[in-house]
Amino acid sequence: MTLRDLSLKQEYRSDRDDVVSEFFVPCLSNCIQYDRTIEYISVKSLSTLTFGLENIQDRQAKIRLISGHRFNTSDLNMLTKLFDQQRSIGRFNGNIIQNDKIKHLQKIINDFKLEVKIAIPNSELVDGTFEERMGIFRDTNDDVVAFSGTSNVTFDTQNRNFESIDVFTSWDDKSRVDIKIKNFENLWTNKTKYVQVYDLLFAERSNLLKYSVEWAVDTN
């Protein structure tokens, strides 16, 4: 099945739709690339996402994430170790990880199927945090589904946030989808005004990230 085969609505809203099962899961299950901008990420959100996306392991699927620069301390420590091992095998012994989802996340990272960059505002006009909420699914036919509006990055069926998303497809609304794609690619290649985009490890080693034990997210 491809993205075009899905029966997608133009909008999903929590009071009348199951956003996760009706939109996110079908799109994730039928894409080969998923691009996402989000205000924050955690070990739990990434491990849940990659564990549920079976085709990322079976095919040459990939995920590109652009996140804001706030992290829970333990999340940042774990993510730094996982991505550091990808580049310097042997620094981090992944065998000590007991959580199956995190083990799967480690494998996805080591196989270069997950890339993470950090967006940091660098202008007096935009001096807070990066909070853009946009996503793009692409399938084997090069069809695209784009969306905006949700802060849910895990696509966990236990998510209880009230939210709504607007959906655009390349076969019905190509101009809007092209704008979303261009916006993401400009961010990814650091060509967007008012923000600077860095590789996760570079941002961490350059002390550009904000972190606190109070920004806690359960990783179990």
Label for each model-derived stretch:
Residues 1-220:
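PLD/PLD-like phosphodiesterase catalytic module centered on the HKD motif
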